[in-house]
C-alpha cells in the first residue's frame, strides 16, 4: 500500500560549490509517500523523483492525490496529474493513468485549492476542484460529517466516494455517501454547508478544518513477474511536470525481499539507494542479497543546462543564447555556466542532465578550482550530490537504470565493473558501457570491486560530453575493511578475504608500452574546410587547432608531423597479459592520464582519474612520466 501525493516543492539539484550558488528548482513537481511528505517539503536536499519497491506476486495498491494548484502560466489554467506505468499488469480502464476512449478519468486536481481567479463573475477556465473542509471534529466510528464546500465548487452527490482528512499521513478515510442534506439536487446550499452520511463509520478521528475531497485516484498493479525497474510518470501535463521531477520508478524485487537502509539496516519505504535482503535469483548465476542503486538519468532539466560557445555566431550575447532556447516548460536560469569542455559544438546550450535530479557540475567545480586533474576529487570539492553507492568487496550490486526523460539518448558507463545488459542471459556480452534511449530501462548486475576485486572509489557516469559537463556522474565506493556506517550484506560476511592487494597474478606474461601525450592540430575530414556554416552564422567545427593525442614513443615524431592525420591509439594485448604502460606527458600545458575502462586495474594507482577519496595523484604533469 502506497499513499502518494504530488507536490509542488523546491528541489536542490546541487549544493553551492565555492562561489557558485546552489542549483535549486523552486518549482519542483514530484511524487512523495504520505509519511515522508513533511520531511521532503522541509528540506529541498531530500526532494527527488520517487522510487518505491514491490516484490514479485505483490498486489500494489496506490492512492494518489495532488497539491499542485492550478497554474495560469504553465498548464493552461488547470492542473491535473496521474500515474502511467509502463510494465505492470493493470486494468487499463482504471489504473492506466491515461484516459483513452471510454476509460474512466484517472487523473485528479489539487485538494488544497479553495480559490480561483474570477473574471466578470465567472471563474477562469476550470471551476474550483471539489474540495471542502470539516466544520466539526469527528471520532472513530462516526458515520456523519458536516462540511463547507469551497466557494463556486461543484457539490458532492449520493453514491460518490470521498476522502476525509486527505492531508493526514496514514489518517485518511475513504467512504461512500448515502445521504446529503440539504439535497443538492433541489438547489445548492447558499452557505455551502452540508451534512453527509456514509455507508459505514470512519476508522480515524478527524479535526475541524481537515480537508474533504473527491480529488484522488486509486490504482492497482499486479506484479506477476521479475520485470525489474518499472518506469511511471505523469501523463496529463508531462511536458510541464517531467522537467521538474514528475516521474518515478517502482522496482520489482525478488519474492520475499525486504528493503533496508545501508547505513542503519532499518526497513525503508523509498529511495534510490537500498540494500535488498533475500534468497531468490536476481540475475544469471546470482542470488541472495544485493546493494541497489536506481540511476534515473535525464535531460531536459533547465536548471542544469549550460551555455555552449564553440561554433556560435561572433558577438552572441548570453541573453540571446539563453533566449534562443527558452520556452514555457523550459525556463533556463540567467546565470547558467558555460560548459566545462570549450570544444563542445552544436547549439547555444545543453539540455540539462543529472542522475535522480542531482548534478555534480564540472563547470561549477572548474570555477571553484581550475585544476582539471582534480575534477572528480572529493578531497578538493567534497562528495558529489548524485547518489553514492557504497559496498564491500564481493557484494552483489544491481544498477536499476532508467532514461526517465525526455529528448536525447545517453550512455551509462561504470568504471572497472562489467555487467550483462540482459541480466538472466548467460550469453549476454559482459560490458561496462550501455547506450540507452528515451524511457528505456535496464537492470545491471555486477560485483563490488569489479574485475580486479579491489577496494577504492570508482566512477559511474553518462558518456555524453555535454551530460558529463552538466554533472551526470557519481561514485561507487568499495571498502575492504568494516565501516561503522555501512552494514554488512547477508551472505558476504567474509568480504575481507575476497579483496585483492596485487592486480596481476604471479607468472602472468607482461606486455609493456611506452606512450606519450602530445599536442597535435587535428583536421577530422581532409575533404572539407575546418568549419561549415550551418545556419544564422552557427558553425559546425571539423578541425581542432588545440588537439591532444596519444602515440607510442617510437611513433610520436611521425604522429606530430604537419599534414599527418593520426588515428586514435590502439594497443593490442592477449587474454591473461599483465599490461604495463609508461605515460609521458609532452603537452605544453595540462596534466595527462591514461584510463582503460573495461579491463582490470588497481583503482588506487592505475585508474587514471583522481576519483573521490582515492589517495595520490593518478595524472602526469607536463614533462613528467608515470
Segments from the language model and where they lie:
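Short proline/glycine- and polar residue-rich coil/turn motifs
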Residues: 109-111, 137-139, 180-190, 211-214, ...
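Autoprocessing Asn-cyclization modules and mimics
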Residues: 128-207
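Short, surface-exposed loop/turn segments at beta-strand-coil junctions that are enriched for proline
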Residues: 222-226, 447-458, 465-467
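A cross-kingdom feature marking solvent-exposed beta-strand/loop segments within repeated
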Residues: 420-447, 459, 604-624
Amino acid at each position: 500500500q502506497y499513499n502518494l501525493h504530488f507536490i509542488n516543492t523546491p528541489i536542490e539539484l546541487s549544493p553551492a560549490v565555492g562561489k557558485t550558488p546552489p542549483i535549486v528548482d523552486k518549482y519542483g513537481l514530484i511524487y512523495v509517500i504520505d509519511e515522508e511528505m513533511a520531511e521532503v517539503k522541509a528540506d529541498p536536499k531530500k526532494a527527488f523523483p520517487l522510487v518505491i519497491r514491490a516484490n514479485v506476486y505483490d498486489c500494489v495498491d496506490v492512492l494518489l492525490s495532488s497539491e499542485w494548484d492550478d497554474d495560469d502560466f504553465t498548464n493552461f489554467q488547470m492542473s491535473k496529474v496521474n500515474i502511467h506505468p509502463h510494465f505492470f499488469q493493470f486494468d487499463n480502464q482504471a489504473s492506466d493513468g491515461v484516459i483513452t476512449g471510454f476509460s474512466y478519468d484517472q487523473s485528479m486536481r489539487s485538494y488544497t485549492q479553495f480559490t480561483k481567479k474570477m473574471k466578470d463573475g465567472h471563474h477562469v477556465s476550470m471551476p474550483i476542484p471539489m474540495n471542502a473542509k470539516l466544520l466539526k471534529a469527528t471520532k472513530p466510528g462516526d458515520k456523519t460529517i458536516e462540511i463547507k464546500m469551497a466557494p463556486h465548487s461543484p457539490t458532492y452527490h449520493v453514491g460518490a466516494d470521498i476522502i476525509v482528512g486527505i492531508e493526514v499521513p496514514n489518517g485518511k478515510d475513504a467512504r461512500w455517501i448515502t445521504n446529503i442534506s440539504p439535497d443538492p439536487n433541489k438547489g445548492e446550499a447558499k452557505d455551502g454547508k452540508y451534512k453527509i452520511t456514509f455507508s459505514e463509520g470512519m476508522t480515524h478521528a478527524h479535526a475541524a478544518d481537515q480537508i474533504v475531497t473527491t480529488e484522488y485516484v486509486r490504482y492497482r498493479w499486479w506484479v506477476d513477474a521479475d520485470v525489474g525497474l518499472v518506469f511511471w510518470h505523469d501523463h496529463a501535463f508531462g511536458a510541464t511536470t517531467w522537467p521538474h521531477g514528475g516521474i518515478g520508478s517502482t522496482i520489482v524485487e525478488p519474492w520475499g525481499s525486504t528493503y533496508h537502509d545501508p547505513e542503519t539496516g532499518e526497513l525503508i519505504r523509498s529511495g534510490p539507494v537500498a540494500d535488498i535482503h533475500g534468497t531468490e535469483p536476481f540475475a544469471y548465476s546470482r542470488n541472495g542479497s544485493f546493494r541497489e542503486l536506481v540511476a534515473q538519468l535525464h535531460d531536459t532539466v533547465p536548471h542544469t543546462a549550460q551555455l555552449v560557445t564553440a561554433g556560435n555566431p561572433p558577438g552572441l550575447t548570453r541573453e540571446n543564447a539563453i533566449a534562443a532556447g527558452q520556452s514555457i516548460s523550459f525556463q533556463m536560469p540567467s546565470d547558467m555556466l558555460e560548459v566545462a569542455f570549450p570544444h563542445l559544438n552544436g547549439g547555444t546550450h545543453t539540455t540539462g542532465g543529472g542522475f535522480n535530479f542531482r548534478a555534480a557540475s564540472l563547470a561549477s567545480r572548474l570555477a571553484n578550482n581550475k585544476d582539471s586533474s582534480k575534477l572528480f576529487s572529493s578531497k578538493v570539492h567534497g562528495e558529489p550530490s548524485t547518489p553514492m553507492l557504497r559496498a564491500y568487496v564481493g557484494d552483489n550490486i544491481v544498477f536499476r537504470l532508467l532514461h526517465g526523460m525526455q529528448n536525447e539518448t545517453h550512455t551509462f558507463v561504470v568504471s572497472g565493473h562489467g555487467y550483462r545488459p540482459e541480466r538472466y542471459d548467460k550469453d549476454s556480452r559482459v560490458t561496462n558501457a550501455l547506450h540507452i534511449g528515451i524511457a528505456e530501462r535496464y537492470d545491471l548486475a555486477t560485483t563490488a570491486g569489479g574485475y580486479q576485486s579491489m577496494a577504492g572509489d570508482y566512477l559511474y557516469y553518462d558518456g555524453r560530453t555535454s551530460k558529463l559537463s552538466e554533472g551526470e556522474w557519481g561514485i561507487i565506493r568499495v571498502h575492504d575493511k568494516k565501516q561503522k556506517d555501512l552494514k554488512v550484506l547477508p551472505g558476504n560476511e567474509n568480504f575481507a578475504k575476497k579483496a585483492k592487494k596485487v592486480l596481476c597474478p604471479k607468472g602472468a606474461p607482461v606486455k609493456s608500452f611506452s606512450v606519450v601525450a602530445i599536442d597535435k592540430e587535428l583536421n577530422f575530414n581532409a575533404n572539407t574546410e575546418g568549419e561549415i556554416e550551418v545556419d544564422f552564422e552557427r558553425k559546425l567545427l571539423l578541425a581542432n587547432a588545440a588537439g591532444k593525442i596519444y602515440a607510442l614513443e617510437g611513433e610520436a615524431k611521425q604522429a606530430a608531423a604537419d599534414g599527418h592525420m593520426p588515428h586514435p591509439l590502439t594497443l593490442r594485448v592477449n587474454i591473461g597479459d599483465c599490461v604495463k604502460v609508461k605515460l609521458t606527458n609532452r603537452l605544453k600545458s595540462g596534466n595527462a592520464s591514461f584510463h582503460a575502462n573495461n579491463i582490470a586495474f588497481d583503482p588506487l594507482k592505475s585508474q587514471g582519474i583522481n576519483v573521490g577519496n582515492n589517495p595520490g595523484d593518478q595524472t602526469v604533469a607536463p614533462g613528467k612520466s608515470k
